[in-house]
Structures are given as structure tokens and as C-alpha cells.
Amino acid sequence: MADDVDQQQTTNTVEEPLDLIRLSLDERIYVKMRNDRELRGRLHAYDQHLNMILGDVEETVTTIEIDEETYEEIYKSTKRNIPMLFVRGDGVVLVAPPLRVG
């Protein structure tokens, strides 16, 4: 019985960086990518290179344009939904686990 408790504590603890991602399997996560891309989706699989398979993904791409008259920066966001997406790990900047309330 004590072994079961120890095993459960080991599976829910974060000792290495990839443990945080392991605990987020089958949960919704936020992924910030290079080139001002952001992804929100359900994590189905990942590997040590941060290659990931995400489902029910909402991709947001932010572009900056400069107004020729006022030289002000104009931010534009484009969103699209993707049912299943393979994310190559070398473009990943940040992975945030789901918000846990409680």
C-alpha cells in the first residue's frame, strides 16, 4: 500500500523539465512559437525534442504593420482552427501547462 502512494507521488511530481509536459498529456496547453505564433490545443504526444502532436488547435498569428503616414505600429491577429497538428520542436519557445484551479 505504501508502494502505491510512493508511485502516485512519483508520477505527479516534477523533477525534470519534461515531467511538466508529461503531466499535461491529454490536457489543453499553450505553446508559444517563433515568428509570433501561438497555439492552444490538447497535447496528444511529445518527444525529447519537443516535437508535439496537438488536437483541436487554435493558432494565432500576430503581424506588425507600420502605418506609412504616422509610422505607428499596427498589430493584426489572424486566427484559425486546426483539427490535428504536428509541431516541430525547434520552433517552440514556451510551453505552458493548463491552469489548475484549487
Swiss-Prot record:
Query: Is this entry keyworded RNA-binding?
Result: yes
Q: Which residues form the Sm domain?
A: 16-101
Q: Which UniProt keywords apply?
A: Acetylation, mRNA processing, mRNA splicing, Nucleus, Ribonucleoprotein, RNA-binding, Spliceosome
Q: Which SUPFAM superfamilies match?
A: Sm-like ribonucleoproteins (SSF50182)
Instruction: Show the SMART domains listed in the entry.
Output: Sm
Q: Name one GO molecular function term.
A: U6 snRNA 3'-end binding
- N-acetylalanine found at: 2
Entry superkingdom: Eukaryota
Which residues are listed as membrane-spanning?
A: none
The subcellular localization recorded is:
Nucleus
Function comment: Plays a role in pre-mRNA splicing as component of the U4/U6-U5 tri-snRNP complex that is involved in spliceosome assembly, and as component of the precatalytic spliceosome (spliceosome B complex). The heptameric LSM2-8 complex binds specifically to the 3'-terminal U-tract of U6 snRNA.
Can you state the subunit structure given in the record?
A: Component of the precatalytic spliceosome (spliceosome B complex). Component of the U4/U6-U5 tri-snRNP complex, a building block of the precatalytic spliceosome (spliceosome B complex). The U4/U6-U5 tri-snRNP complex is composed of the U4, U6 and U5 snRNAs and at least PRPF3, PRPF4, PRPF6, PRPF8, PRPF31, SNRNP200, TXNL4A, SNRNP40, SNRPB, SNRPD1, SNRPD2, SNRPD3, SNRPE, SNRPF, SNRPG, DDX23, CD2BP2, PPIH, SNU13, EFTUD2, SART1 and USP39, plus LSM2, LSM3, LSM4, LSM5, LSM6, LSM7 and LSM8.
Which PANTHER family has this protein been placed in? U6 SNRNA-ASSOCIATED SM-LIKE PROTEIN LSM3
- The protein's name in its UniProt record: U6 snRNA-associated Sm-like protein LSm3
Q: Which gene encodes it?
A: LSM3
